[in-house]
């Protein structure tokens, strides 16, 4: 499947929603510390409901520790500074999709090391700055999953 990477997430409700999304899609979740909340935060638990046990979650102390542990072949950064739209990328099994913290995004020190074609964006209107983190993850996850034929999904309607 694919992997979602949250770089230093700050808002527990967003992370809880993303945990629930990962449980429902089979995508793995990586959390790069420091987190802006404690792991036992009741807001994290409430927003993720009882889905925490159904999601595969890995925590990493630093971005470098994440890279060393996972060795991603293709790591995409979702950023307002991206060039191709999320729907223009041809996702593959094994891809990693990284999202930055809610108030500041992925640091430029990381973005500057990435190829331009791996810095992707979600289209928005001219006056918009950014989208909510959990919404951005959901939009991108479902586009990637659609491209992969909803691998692992059940009860798919037949299209004629």
From Swiss-Prot:
Domain of life: Bacteria
EC number(s) on file: 2.1.1.207
Any single GO BP term: wobble position uridine ribose methylation
GO-annotated molecular function: identical protein binding; RNA binding; tRNA (5-carboxymethylaminomethyluridine(34)-2'-O)-methyltransferase activity; tRNA (cytidine(34)-2'-O)-methyltransferase activity
Chief localisation class: cytoplasm
Catalytic reactions of this protein: cytidine(34) in tRNA + S-adenosyl-L-methionine = 2'-O-methylcytidine(34) in tRNA + S-adenosyl-L-homocysteine + H(+); 5-carboxymethylaminomethyluridine(34) in tRNA(Leu) + S-adenosyl-L-methionine = 5-carboxymethylaminomethyl-2'-O-methyluridine(34) in tRNA(Leu) + S-adenosyl-L-homocysteine + H(+)
Function recorded in the entry: Methylates the ribose at the nucleotide 34 wobble position in the two leucyl isoacceptors tRNA(Leu)(CmAA) and tRNA(Leu)(cmnm5UmAA). Catalyzes the methyl transfer from S-adenosyl-L-methionine to the 2'-OH of the wobble nucleotide.
Subunit structure: Homodimer.
Name of the protein in its database record: tRNA (cytidine(34)-2'-O)-methyltransferase
Record organism: Haemophilus influenzae (strain ATCC 51907 / DSM 11121 / KW20 / Rd)
